[in-house]
Each structure stands twice: as structure tokens, then as C-alpha cells.
């Protein structure tokens, strides 16, 4: 039910917003905004690096955040990568995986989409690591998360179109893609 409800919301709201954003925003600006949202996620990545005892990654993440938040103008530019500090991604679902927690059942969460039980729990914990959760008011957070949602949905326009045009069953294709994508992320 949530899969098709999310699909309807995507078709009626999120995809048109993402297409409008793509049409109105030059590609370099779209990339800059994507980098800025990536930068805002670095405190979450840092916390999970520490929990996974990956101290070199944690030092890199902290350095990237400091450099890109200042010299990179709030993350619009990835100055840290130019200095050799390459980005990586991690979350609390990956932290749980590192401690041996299995996937659990496949879920489709309202608005958040497909995930597993482990990663759904990770979403909740990651929100506690996110400074936006405790530094911003609810309306500012909603505006910021909505903006990030549009930016992220724009990045997926072509992939989603390909999937919906070529899959026999959208539900099964998304489920398989979710597990494949997550498996790739877990083994990096």
C-alpha cells in the first residue's frame, strides 16, 4: 500500500517539482546544491565513522566538514576533495551491519520509500545525530528537508524513468534494486 501511495505522491508532487527544478536550475547550480546537502550530512557520517571504529574515516569526514563549510562556502564547493580528502558515506544502518545485525524484513516507509527493518531503525538514530534536528525549528527543518528531497529526486529522474519503463513489476524491481544498492554500499 505504501509503495503505491508513495508512487502516487511522486507522480503528482515530487517528480513535477524535481522536473521543474531541473528545468529552472543550471546544472552547475544543481551540483553545488547537492554538494551543500552532502555537507550537511557529514556530522551524521562522522558519528557513524566513530561508532564503526573507523577513525581514519572519521578524521577525513571531520576535515571535509570543516574545510567545505568554510572554504567551500557551506559545502557549495568541494574544496576538500581538491585537497585529496575524498568523500565516503555511511549511516547507522551500516553501523548496525558492522556489528552483525541482519537486514530484517523489507519495508516501504511513507515518504522515505523502500528500506529494511535495520535501515529503518538506522534512519531514526541518524536523525538524532543530525544537528538540524536539534538546532532548527520544525518549519525550518521541514523547508530544508523538502529542498533536499527535491534535489535528491532530481538526481534520480532518469533512473526512475528507466526502471518504470523497463520493469515488468515496479514493486519487484524496486525491491531488488534496494537490496542490490544496499549490498554495494555495505561492502565498500
PLM features: what roles do these ranges have?
Residues 94, 99-188:
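A structured, mid-to-C-terminal "fold-capping" secondary-structure block
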Residues 12-28:
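Membrane interface segments of multi-pass transport proteins and intramembrane proteases
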Amino acid at each position: 500500500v505504501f509503495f503505491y501511495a508513495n508512487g502516487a505522491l511522486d507522480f503528482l508532487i515530487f517528480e513535477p517539482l524535481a522536473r521543474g527544478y531541473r528545468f529552472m536550475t543550471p546544472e552547475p547550480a544543481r551540483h553545488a546544491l547537492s554538494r551543500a546537502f552532502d555537507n550537511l550530512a557529514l556530522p551524521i557520517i562522522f558519528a557513524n565513522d566513530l561508532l564503526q571504529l573507523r577513525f581514519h574515516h572519521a578524521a577525513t569526514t571531520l576535515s571535509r566538514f570543516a574545510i567545505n563549510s568554510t572554504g567551500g562556502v557551506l559545502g557549495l564547493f568541494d574544496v576538500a576533495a581538491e585537497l585529496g580528502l575524498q568523500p565516503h558515506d555511511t549511516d547507522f544502518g551500516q553501523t548496525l551491519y558492522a556489528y552483525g545485525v541482519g537486514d530484517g524484513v523489507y519495508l516501504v516507509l511513507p515518504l522515505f520509500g523502500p528500506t529494511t527493518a535495520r535501515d529503518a531503525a538506522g534512519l531514526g538514530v541518524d536523525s538524532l545525530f543530525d544537528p538540524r534536528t536539534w538546532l532548527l525549528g520544525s518549519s525550518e527543518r521541514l523547508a530544508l528537508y523538502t529542498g533536499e528531497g527535491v534535489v535528491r529526486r532530481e538526481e534520480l529522474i532518469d533512473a526512475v524513468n528507466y526502471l518504470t519503463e523497463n520493469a515488468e513489476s515496479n514493486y519487484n524491481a524496486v525491491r531488488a534494486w534496494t537490496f542490490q544498492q544496499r549490498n554495494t554500499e555495505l561492502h565498500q
